[in-house]
Design a protein with these regions (language model features):
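Well-ordered, non-membrane alpha-helical segments in soluble/globular domains
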Residues: 16-21, 156-164
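Conserved SAM/AdoMet-binding glycine-rich loop
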Residues: 1-80, 87-88, 94
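Short linear capping/connector segments at secondary-structure termini
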Residues: 3-6, 104, 148
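Glycine-rich tight-turn/loop motif centered on a GG-T
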Residues: 71-82, 146-154
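Secondary-structure boundary/capping positions in well-ordered alpha/beta enzyme cores
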Residues: 31, 57, 150, 174-175
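Conserved C-terminal portion of the radical SAM core fold
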Residues: 83-142, 158-176
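Short, hinge-like loop/turn segments at secondary-structure boundaries
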Residues: 51-53, 80, 118-120, 148-150
Length: 177
């Protein structure tokens, strides 16, 4: 599988995206695509093409949900709300395309209880696949500056593992993690 993971792999004119995807599919032994993107970088025109692509090759579209909490999404400057994620996931899944999501446990302002609360909301989404990430603070970013000025709670490794387990226990059982 060719994995278009980094950045927003649907943020370009459709003809450019088609060239990229078709070029990847032309490589020997590439049997399908996994396209990671943002929920606010999807259009009906692109979904039409992805539906056609899905009819002739293996395809997964993954969305960076990150959180279901709109306050958190604003805090981390995502530029979209949770409803945007819900819509994009539904529109993609309803076209028969395998649909994935990415969430981050431990975002600023989200404690263990908040993360666990979100599992049932994520379970209600039309997701086939879910990837769970830990919070990463990268030097030179706005989040790193914020943390240096006013540190917020970070999970210890044991707290993160316990939170993941509790989250998974509440997640819909047919979602591939």
């Amino acid at each position: 599988l060719a994995y278009f993971q980094a950045y927003s792999n649907t943020y370009a004119p459709l003809d450019v995206l088609k060239r990229r995807y078709e070029e990847a599919l032309a490589v020997d032994d590439v049997v399908g695509l996994v396209i990671g993107t943002r929920p606010d970088c999807i259009s009906t025109e692109l979904l039409d093409y992805l539906e056609e692509l899905n009819s002739r090759t293996f395809l997964i579209v993954e969305y960076g949900i990150e959180s279901v909490n709109d306050d958190t999404l604003r805090h981390i400057n995502r530029g979209h709300d949770f409803e945007c994620s819900r819509r994009a996931i539904e529109l993609t899944h309803d076209r028969g395309i395998l649909t994935g999501g990415h969430i981050i446990l431990g975002l600023p302002g989200e404690d263990r209880e908040e993360n666990i609360r979100q599992a049932s909301i994520v379970s209600d989404l039309k997701l086939d696949i879910l990837k769970i990430h830990q919070l990463q603070i990268i030097r030179g970013t706005q989040l790193a500056d914020e943390y240096m000025q006013q540190p917020f709670k970070l999970f210890t490794p044991d707290e993160y593992i316990d939170t993941c387990i509790a989250y998974l226990e509440r997640l819909r059982s047919d979602i591939i993690v």
